Amino acid sequence: MITEFIDGLQQFHFLQNALITAIAIGIVAGAVGCFIILRGMSLMGDAISHAVLPGVALSFILGINFFIGAIVFGLLASVLITYIKSNSIIKSDTAIGITFSSFLALGVILIGVAKSSTDLFHILFGNILAVQDRDMWITIGVGAAVLLVIVLLFRPLLLTSFDPVLAQSMGVRVKVYHYLLMVLLTLVSVTAMQSVGTILIVAMLITPAATAYLYTNSLWSMMLLSSGLGALASILGLFIGYSLNIAVGSCIVLTSAVFFLISFFIAPKQRKNEHALSSH
């Protein structure tokens, strides 16, 4: 199987594109996912990843690049969720649930109008083996831009993630960085549609970051480990999916889940926590 996969990489351009794209998505999703984990925003990641669906469907209807529609609707969902939470007594999980279900319902309606089930099926569940050169370079470009923003604004992102009250008292514009993170999350969700589809994007964001969190208390180390695990899961998932002729996106997600399951039992932080619980 390994030999056949390596031969395929040497012979088939589509497999080369798939590998490069999968690694790029694994790295950037792993990095952004760390901030999502630390802020307790896993539900927000799930909501935005599904909220891009009507944008994709509308893009097919209008005949424009689906990146445009997906980004617009992803940002719209994040702004709407934050606005509802900030300007009413409704809690964030309720705001997320309302927005998530509404956007998903709109997406289903637009899918019926678009009448392009094949392409939209790939958007829902991913088809990384169909990634073209243009899509690959867009993914690399978006991923590089997201990572650059994280590096340049690491300190305020770190501060607003761990202690937003302290950050506010120091003059840091907490809301600005919240919306910035939502923009980054939306961009990652759009690019990850290529590999795992809108249904499984949240797993690419959350699982590697959660696994890395079991091993380290340093955000830099967590980001590096999470990105590495995301890339490794993407490589192994692509290998398994291609070799067995099964869904590559699902293989990537399950591989990442296996990493988490193993780490759950062997990670030092997890074992210390179990020891502390058993001593009470």
Model-identified regions with their sequence ranges:
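Transmembrane helix-bundle core of multi-pass membrane transporters
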Residues: 2-17, 88, 96-155
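Short juxtamembrane and helix-loop transition motifs at transmembrane-helix boundaries
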Residues: 4-13, 27-38, 55-65, 158-166, ...
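Loop-to-transmembrane alpha-helix initiation sites
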Residues: 18, 66-74, 93-97, 135, ...
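Helix-loop-helix "hairpin" substructures at the membrane interface of multi-pass membrane proteins
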Residues: 25, 136-208
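Short loop segments and helix-boundary regions at transmembrane helix junctions
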Residues: 34-116, 213-224, 241-244, 267-268
